[in-house]
Design a protein with these regions (language model features):
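Active-site neighborhoods and metal-handling regions in enzymes and metal-associated proteins
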Residues: 20-320
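Sec-dependent N-terminal signal peptides
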Residues: 4-13
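Sec/Tat signal peptide C-region and signal peptidase I cleavage site
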Residues: 15-19
């Protein structure tokens, strides 16, 4: 049986076993909690000052979490617990963040519990009392018309919060949109240092998926490859934050439609020599995500490299 060689258009990485580079879950949890504490102490004060927000309130009930609130939970918490209320106050005298969890217990090691249940049996009363004691100029809540991630407070929680707030505090309510987006998009130096390895792991998974170990021309389908990527990511101890996609461009009479290739492609489209294969995958690790797309060309019999037209197209595209 003739073997077909795959030429990866983008750069390749070494053959190091990426599964051996992924930390055990227990070690990952330690990293996640350390990185979270660094983020709260290191970047949140500057972001709140920049966005002119001195009090940020996040409220979620268990299993219906605000996506931003979830980023403040410790690694062992897979969801909020009952009703979780977090308050971050930027002290103007010290310039430091005061962290409070109006909850039955501390939220990990980073956010201590601040609910005196004997004095304030009603959790909402405890929240309002804490906010009032800080005399904030703004009370930022996660609601937004434009950014879904910054629109995490539910209708019920929003209405209850307004109901309990006195008029003097209610008029200070503002959208936390700019702060929520800034929190999600800003990374610490330590997180940035992790990203090259995370990108490399993603490329290595793609490299293996584009190899003869996985693809047999005339037999392997795009859906076979999609599910191979999904399973390989899981087997490596990683997660994926969106379902992988694999599409094909080939010489035929059908005009290529990128929307159809993404959402309405044949699930059993068999890979053939001469195909230009495209993959889009993203992995999650230590609460960081990648989003990587690569192409590969499947050589026709007698070819030793991709056609000049394809090489030229990628040379021009890679200038960006």
């Amino acid at each position: 049986m003739q073997k077909f060689i795959f030429i990866l258009i983008l750069c390749l990485f070494g053959r190091t076993s990426y599964s051996q580079e992924v930390l055990p879950l227990r070690e990952q949890a330690k990293w996640v909690d350390e990185l979270l504490n660094e983020r709260i102490e290191g970047i949140l004060p500057g972001l709140m000052k920049r966005e002119q927000i001195d009090c940020w309130v996040l409220i979620s009930r268990e299993y219906n979490e605000d996506p931003v609130l979830k980023t403040f939970l410790p690694a062992e918490w897979l969801s909020a617990r009952r009703r979780t209320m977090l308050v971050f106050y930027l002290n103007p005298q010290t310039g430091k963040i005061e962290k409070h969890a109006i909850a039955r217990y501390a939220v990990g090691k980073s956010i201590p519990a601040s609910w005196d249940m004997q004095k304030y049996p009603d959790q909402w009363d405890a929240l309002v009392q804490l906010i009032a004691s800080k005399h904030p100029t703004t009370i930022a809540i996660n609601y937004s018309n434009d950014f879904a991630h910054a629109d995490g407070i539910t209708h019920t929680e929003f209405d209850l919060f307004k109901k309990y707030l006195p008029d003097s505090l209610r008029k200070k309510m503002v959208s936390a949109e700019s702060l929520a987006v800034a929190w999600l998009e800003t990374r610490t130096e330590r997180e940035i240092a992790i990203y090259p390895k995370l990108i490399q792991l993603t490329h290595q998974i793609i490299q293996e998926g584009f190899s003869e170990k996985v693809i047999t021309p005339g037999i392997t389908s795009t859906d076979d490859l999609v599910w191979w990527f999904r399973q390989r990511i899981r087997n490596a101890g990683l997660d994926t934050w969106f379902h992988p996609s694999v599409s094909i461009q080939r010489k035929d009479s059908v005009v290529f439609d990128h929307l159809k290739a993404f959402s309405d492609r044949p699930r059993e489209d068999i890979l053939q020599p001469g195909d230009l294969i495209h993959v889009d995958i993203g992995i999650s690790y230590l609460r960081l995500q990648t989003d990587v797309q690569e192409h590969a060309y499947l050589l026709l019999p007698g070819e030793t490299q991709a056609p000049a037209s394809i090489q030229q197209a990628f040379s021009k595209a890679n200038r960006l």
